[in-house]
Curated annotation (Swiss-Prot):
Name used for this protein in its record: Zinc import ATP-binding protein ZnuC
Species: Photorhabdus laumondii subsp. laumondii (strain DSM 15139 / CIP 105565 / TT01) (Photorhabdus luminescens subsp. laumondii)
Membrane topology: Peripheral membrane protein
Molecular functions per Gene Ontology: ABC-type zinc transporter activity; ATP binding; ATP hydrolysis activity
Localisation: Cell inner membrane
Family in the record: Belongs to the ABC transporter superfamily. Zinc importer (TC 3.A.1.15.5) family.
Amino acid sequence: MSTLITLKNVAVNFGDRRVLNNISLHLQRGNILTLLGPNGAGKSTLVRVVLGLIEPSSGTIEQTDGLKIGYVPQKLHLDPTLPLTVKRFMMLKPGVKSGDILPALERVNAAHLLQQPMQKLSGGESQRVLLARALLNQPQLLVLDEPTQGVDVNGQLALYDLINQIRTELHCAVLMVSHDLHLVMAKTDEVLCLNQHICCSGTPEVVSTHPEFIAMFGHHGAEQLAIYRHQHDHHQHNHHHDLKGKIILENNRECHS
């Protein structure tokens, strides 16, 4: 398994305030790493360090030459008076060819949105368009900052399934910031709990029993994490979710529970 980015003892200061301290991690192809932590923990700052938007105050970053990164921001802020269709929005990405747009939207089951105004999209539709845009350059690393913010629970299930499928197809690394403990954990390979420093890291099973994780999210959060992961691995392997969140069994029948 090849390592795409390595952070070693990275720290970030904003003036006199230390936002990140002694961060070391590896992003590897085919792996999903999920960042968890309270508000103000430095999660978005760490994402910007990985994207190369913030220079660390100390420590080192090593990355593969020519690394292609796709980024899905937490939220897109558009001028409501600016007429902008999904197609025109996708064309704003440098180097994009018109013929690349529809296949990317089809990949995330959003081709029907091609001529829709960006401002009229629902939360789930907007996130799928942002994901399609991030896939235009066939990224080796996909970075998602709270990808399901503003999306209902059913839409969240569908988005996480989709991200997992993309990881498998592209064999890309995925770095994801999330608060959705019980939803995201069924798909992630590694969890990193952040609160300016790395409190704990490892598989969901390991992290869910760690004292610092329990201190951060409480016993209920830890139980939720461990139980969901166990149930999903052992009892929910015979289905996936469509983009409306409906459960689809492997024989393509809908489950109407």
